[in-house]
């Protein structure tokens, strides 16, 4: 239950983050927002790093930490950029290929056992998402950015699962923003615009929400099977669709409502299944 709560919380926080980035893109380029998001996150995490004392240990895999940072940096820049170019619901819908990639990666690389229900829900969720996207529509630059980000995000997620066996969540988060700051900083120089005091407040809020969302996401992936979580990742589409409708006057058509309802049903079925399994484990006596 706790991992599911963490993942759904991260979905909500990332949806709010997407809305803030879209709003902020009117004044600050998304790449510059990505740079400040990481820079401010370093400052936010330093007290926790000091408390941890030893952030890198003998068993740390530096190469994987660097790889995770690189893929995370690419994901962030591309996602932030896509939010400014296409409707939130469409950007988030495209990113829903990420759960499918992570799901398949968990089975192939981590040999996680799955069930027919898991397979059915993840496949149905992906199909419903594709219907919402409607690929027959014009493929815009923002859609391409979101799709590439979905692939790099999945790779980053699989690396998190691999590294989390030996690393703390703080190590994973701090190493990521430490690497992502220069990655986002280089292209930021080409689009730089000095933020005023109000824009700086917005950047701080973006960074705080992104840091909280990343903590929930990283923690959730590190403490349970990936195949048990990915069906709940579709809740992001519901959150972003609602936020887009309320704040950006983005239209919600009948197809989106029907498919969105299907995604909610998928998540509820999976939730009931997890609860039932937990109760069965509790009832079974110890041998």
List PLM regions with ranges.
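Membrane-interface interhelical linkers
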Residues: 1-12, 42-67, 116, 165, ...
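Loop-to-transmembrane alpha-helix entry segments
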Residues: 95, 111-131, 140-143, 197, ...
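Hydrophobic/small/kink-forming positions within alpha-helical transmembrane segments
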Residues: 11-16, 46, 69, 73-77, ...
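C-terminal-most transmembrane helix of multi-pass membrane proteins
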Residues: 234-287
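Juxtamembrane helix-entry segments on the extracytoplasmic side of multipass membrane proteins
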Residues: 1-3, 35, 57-61, 134-155, ...
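Helix-helix packing/entry segments at the starts of transmembrane helices
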Residues: 36, 91-97, 163-178, 214-246
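Alpha-helical transmembrane segments of compact multi-pass small-molecule transporters, enriched
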Residues: 40-44, 94-108, 120-123, 179-183, ...
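Transmembrane alpha-helical segments that form core, pore/gating elements
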Residues: 19-22, 30, 45, 136-195, ...
